[in-house]
Design a protein with these regions (language model features):
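Bacterial N-terminal signal peptides that target proteins for export
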Residues: 1-11
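Bacterial N-terminal signal peptides
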Residues: 9-21
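Structured C-terminal helix/loop/strand segments within mature extracytoplasmic catalytic/sensor domains
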Residues: 27-41, 69, 126, 175-205, ...
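Short, conserved catalytic-motif segment at the N-terminal edge
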Residues: 40, 46-70, 93
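Mid-domain, small-residue-enriched loop/turn segments at the edges of structured enzyme/sensor domains
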Residues: 48, 121-182
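Soluble periplasmic/extracytoplasmic beta-strand elements of cell-envelope proteins
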Residues: 50-55, 63, 79, 112, ...
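Active-site SXXK
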Residues: 59, 70-99, 111, 245
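Conserved catalytic neighborhood of penicillin-recognizing serine enzymes
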Residues: 93-133, 161, 166
């Protein structure tokens, strides 16, 4: 017996929903100037860059190629950490659980601070592999981000510049960062644990942190593959405001210095807005 056919109009609408790309990520009106400054900077640099920066206080965002997918490399380890910590919060796991002879807390420390790939795959195996991370991302409604392979599998394969697996858009990454920060997916205790590890990231001294004023608090996670250089995380502004930042770089050269320049441009724009607001307040007194 033949299965009933979908009405033609319904079938066409389903196909269209799959094939039509999502609307381009747009910068907030008040940050168009910052978008232009970043675009001008990147126009003079070889390679492809994707940037998103989200003000966690008021929700304003700047985006350059923010809806373009880039290989995540080791920045995916934040999603792995979040998946494990969410299960800790649900009482299903503990940071004291032993994973290949070490407490889970130590394994996660190696994964985030040192970007240890073996520790990452050990934690990932405990969770059930990449499919478990993808299920968690889907449950949190974070489109534009996917995990397909273990780190060992990822490193064995070539062609990272054109890879369509294990990718994220900059906007998807700052969406994940926002959820990690605002308490919607992690308890305060788990959030504090993860951010403390990110603040000690040992692989990012030449990226987001490099050109920021001394003493600026940064919590980040880097990612590196052949031809791929990434850094994502949080910058705390002088007024306490926090900005989630994702910078993905593909191809070209001198990618680390460019990421540092991008971070400084973002920092200066948000710092200027703080100073301008203070000046206006003083004038109105």
């Amino acid at each position: 017996m033949r299965a009933p056919q979908l009405p033609r109009l319904l079938l066409c609408s389903i196909v269209a929903s799959v094939l039509v790309p999502a609307p381009a990520a747009a910068s907030s009106p008040e940050l168009i100037g910052l978008e232009r400054a970043l675009s001008t900077l990147l126009a003079e640099r070889p390679g492809d860059y994707g940037i998103a920066a989200l003000d966690l206080r008021d929700g304003s965002m700047v985006s350059v190629n923010g809806d373009t997918s880039f290989p995540m490399a080791s920045t995916v380890k934040l999603a792995i950490a979040a998946t494990y910590l969410a299960e800790v919060d649900q009482g299903r796991r503990s940071l004291g659980d032993m994973i290949v002879g070490r407490p889970a807390a130590k394994v996660m420390e190696l994964m985030i601070i040192r970007s240890d790939n073996r520790a990452t795959d050990q934690l990932l195996a405990t969770l059930g592999g990449p499919v478990a991370i993808q299920q968690w991302l889907s449950s949190q409604k974070i489109p534009g981000m996917r995990m397909d392979r273990t780190i060992a599998q990822l490193l064995r394969e070539r062609g990272h510049l054109a890879d369509s697996k294990d990718v994220a858009t900059p906007v998807a990454m700052v969406t994940l960062l926002s959820k990690l920060d605002d308490g919607t997916v992690l308890t305060a205790q788990s959030r504090t644990f993860l951010l403390e590890l990110m603040s000690r990231c040992a692989t990012g001294t030449r990226r987001i942190r490099a050109l920021l004023p001394a003493g600026t608090r940064v919590e980040d996670k880097t990612g590196t593959l052949d031809g791929i250089t990434n850094d994502v995380g949080f910058i705390t502004m002088p007024d306490g405001r926090r900005v989630a930042v994702a910078v993905f770089a593909r191809g070209g050269r001198d990618r680390q210095p460019v990421i540092a320049e991008v971070a400084r441009v973002i920092y200066d724009r948000f710092a200027d807005s703080m100073r301008n607001a203070l000046a206006l307040f003083l004038q109105m007194r």
